[in-house]
């Protein structure tokens, strides 16, 4: 999709599968997740003659979830794999699906609305299919991806993982019980 997008004219359906700008200062207040490797969340593409948005590495451009065609393709991909017998999906980097000026671009209401639609779709067509949210957030933010039982059925608890190692190293349960108390 990206090769097609970068070779298509501005404003075309193909180009709009990704988030592009002429101004790399757009969303300037959004944190850069991998600061050791990326100087910006925007990377110049010499073919498209525009900057494309990536929340992680420059070789991982973000899809434009505001584009209904992108959403349609996601539904088709889910259907394809469910028809092949897959009954669970890890939804990677789920807090970062949408971009909104004036926000930190994390945990936005649009993300939850999309997840509700996707969950309703699989519940109707493929009952028993599960979604695992990969949301590297503090527990109170990550828990929101359960919705009211209408988003993801499971969720990683990222803060507990490094604390397990810390507890072993310190020979103390406190790092684990502390994060669960939060």
What are these regions (language model features)?
Residues 88-90, 128-132, 153-155:
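Structural preference for beta-strand elements that scaffold enzyme active sites
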Residues 135-182:
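Noncatalytic carbohydrate-binding groove/subsite architecture in carbohydrate-active enzymes
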Residues 1-75, 79, 83, 94-149, ...:
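Acidic/aromatic-lined carbohydrate-recognition and catalytic surfaces
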């Amino acid at each position: 999709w990206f090769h097609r997008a970068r070779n298509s004219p501005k404003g075309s359906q193909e180009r709009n599968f990704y988030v592009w700008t002429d101004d790399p200062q757009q969303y300037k207040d959004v944190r850069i997740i991998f600061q050791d490797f990326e100087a910006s969340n925007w990377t110049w593409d010499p073919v498209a003659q525009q900057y494309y948005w990536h929340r992680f590495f420059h070789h991982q451009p973000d899809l434009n979830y505001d584009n209904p065609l992108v959403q349609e393709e996601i539904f088709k991909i889910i259907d394809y794999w469910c028809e092949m017998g897959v009954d669970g999906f890890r939804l990677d980097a789920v807090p970062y699906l949408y971009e909104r000026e004036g926000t930190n671009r994390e945990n936005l209401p649009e993300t939850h609305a999309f997840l509700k639609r996707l969950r309703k779709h699989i519940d109707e067509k493929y009952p028993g299919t599960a979604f695992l949210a990969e949301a590297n957030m503090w527990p109170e933010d990550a828990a929101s991806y359960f919705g009211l039982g209408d988003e993801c059925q499971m969720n990683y608890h990222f803060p507990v993982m490094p604390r397990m190692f810390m507890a072993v190293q310190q020979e103390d349960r406190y790092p684990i019980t502390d994060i669960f108390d939060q």
